[in-house]
Design a protein with these regions (language model features):
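Hydrophobic alpha-helical
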Residues: 67-86, 171-226
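Hinge/beta->alpha junction and helix N-cap segments in small-molecule ligand-binding domains
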Residues: 12-21, 42-52, 109-115, 136-154, ...
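Hydrophobic alpha-helical segments within soluble ligand-binding/sensing domains
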Residues: 107-133, 181, 243-260
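Conserved beta-strand elements of the Class I
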Residues: 8, 132-136, 192
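Signal peptide-proximal N-terminal region
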Residues: 28-40
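Flexible loop/hinge segments that line or gate small-molecule binding clefts
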Residues: 77-114, 224-232
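Hinge/cleft segment of the Venus flytrap/periplasmic-binding protein
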Residues: 140-144, 159, 243-287
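N-terminal helix-turn-helix/winged-helix DNA-binding helices
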Residues: 1-17
Length: 287
């Protein structure tokens, strides 16, 4: 009865990143709940750079455990790591993004394509006249991740599927980091709506506010403090919430069901996408 189950948790460092902090909070919540069943978590963190990721990969591959919870950020390195890890024949759950075609692995998280498709609908909603849409990519190298690209793909697909929406014209801007000094007024000349396919919508919002540009519809992701600030001010219109805490919790829950209860569990668990507007954002009260 007193068997211990060791789960390796392999994630990016989270100190100042709310999204990953929330993932960890969900994982911790599950850890506490399931500790009485002998579940022990061993954490492996990597910094947001490839060399740190590779260092941690070595440790994770050497570590003996019953299952792995993994958030793949660097696409190619993660694919390589997975194919190496598969030789261990232990269950693997991915959270945040799904990079594997292997049906044996589980995935808990958003359907990235679908979330981009949803953003397309939100942009087109209740709009009749000619619209200029800007897809604003604020990306560090790591975000050539599949999630990012799938969201953009989903976004364009919405308009492909709705050919009657002839009044939308698209342009793209890419900046390399989140410095507001990279933005200029010309980027937004004539623009009616902006889609930011990651959690940095607040950078666009801050720029528009500073330059007193009003009436631009902004859609982004994730309930970061800064995003919420501009949502409440009415500068950001919609945020798509991926419920990171639930992802972390469900990832551990999946392994608990599979290994401890030995239940058959579905390998894909999509977290429902939440559309957050100023009017329906009620922060969770810390009890």
């Amino acid at each position: 009865l007193n068997k211990k189950f060791h789960f390796a948790v392999f994630l990016p460092q989270y100190e100042n990143l709310e999204y990953w902090k929330s993932q960890i909070a969900g994982i911790e919540k599950a850890a506490i709940e399931f500790s009485k069943f002998g579940i022990v978590l061993d954490y492996f963190f990597y910094d947001f750079n490839i060399s740190s990721f590779k260092e941690s990969v070595k440790k994770v591959l050497e570590f003996d455990c019953d299952a792995l919870l993994f958030a793949p950020i660097f696409y190619e390195e993660s694919v390589r790591f997975l194919s190496e890890y598969e030789k261990k024949n232990t269950p693997i759950v991915m959270i945040d993004s799904n990079i594997s075609n292997n049906d044996q692995h589980a995935y808990v998280g958003q359907d990235a394509f679908q979330s981009g498709y949803l953003a397309g609908r939100l942009i087109s909603f209740a709009v009749k006249n000619e619209r200029q849409i800007l897809i604003f990519k604020i990306t560090r190298e790591i975000e050539s991740t599949s999630v990012y690209l799938q969201r953009i793909d989903g976004f364009y697909s919405f308009f492909k599927d709705h050919e009657e929406l002839q009044n939308f014209k698209f342009s793209e801007v890419t900046i390399k980091d989140s410095g507001i000094d990279q933005l200029n007024l010309e980027m937004f000349s004539g623009i009616n709506s902006v889609f930011v396919p990651n959690s940095r919508a607040y950078i666009v919002a801050r720029f528009l506010e500073q330059n007193n540009i009003k009436g631009v519809r902004i859609i982004g992701y994730d309930l970061l403090k800064e995003n919420i600030e501009y949502l409440n001010k009415g500068v950001i219109d919609f945020l798509i919430n991926q419920r990171p805490e639930e992802q972390g919790y469900m990832g551990i829950n999946h392994l608990y069901k599979k290994l401890v209860l030995q239940e058959t569990v579905a390998n894909t668990h999509y977290i429902p996408l939440e559309i957050i507007l100023k009017e329906n954002y009620f922060p969770a009260r810390k009890s």
